[in-house]
A protein has these predicted regions:
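Tandem CBS (Cystathionine beta-synthase) repeat/Bateman regulatory domains
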Residues: 1-147
């Protein structure tokens, strides 16, 4: 069985140069933990995850202690940092060395890559073009419906 047999086509994606605000909006409405990132020629360049976005907005320990050191201070600092960063571009947050598979790869190979590397959703890229994603849920669906 091939990756193309079970992958999700038309994955949630965003372009380089988009804002952190736009990425956060897309993550929240698409209900996926990561967005595939494309350049202006629609070539796959990497991904940005909800963890990357939250981590960028987390206050530094020094900022929390300077604000008073309480949990409420930390959350207020988190929100302020989020507002400050919202209009910045996602480009520095993009993971550019992401593992990928091709649509013509054997599904078993992709499953091994995902499990060995702890990957929940794997970009499917053919000749530099994003053609889909393969998730652990897609793997489970393959087992259920194709066995």
């Amino acid at each position: 069985m091939l990756v193309s047999d079970v992958m999700t086509a038309f994955p949630a994606h965003i372009r380089l140069g988009a804002t952190i605000r736009r990425a956060a909006e897309l993550v929240s409405v698409s209900e996926v933990g990561q967005l595939m990132v494309l350049d202006h020629d629609s070539r796959f360049v990497g991904l940005v995850s909800e963890e990357d976005l939250v981590r960028a907005m987390l206050p530094r320990f020094e900022d929390v202690t300077a604000a008073g050191g309480t949990l409420a201070d930390a959350f207020r600092t988190f929100l302020e940092r989020g507002r400050t960063l919202a209009d910045r571009v996602i480009d520095p947050l993009v993971v550019r060395d992401a593992a990928t598979v091709r649509s013509t790869d054997e599904l078993a190979r992709a499953a091994v890559v995902m499990i060995d590397r702890g990957i929940r959703r794997l970009p499917v890229v053919d000749n530099g073009v994003l053609v889909g994603t393969l998730s652990r849920a897609d793997l489970c669906r393959a087992v259920i419906y194709h066995s």
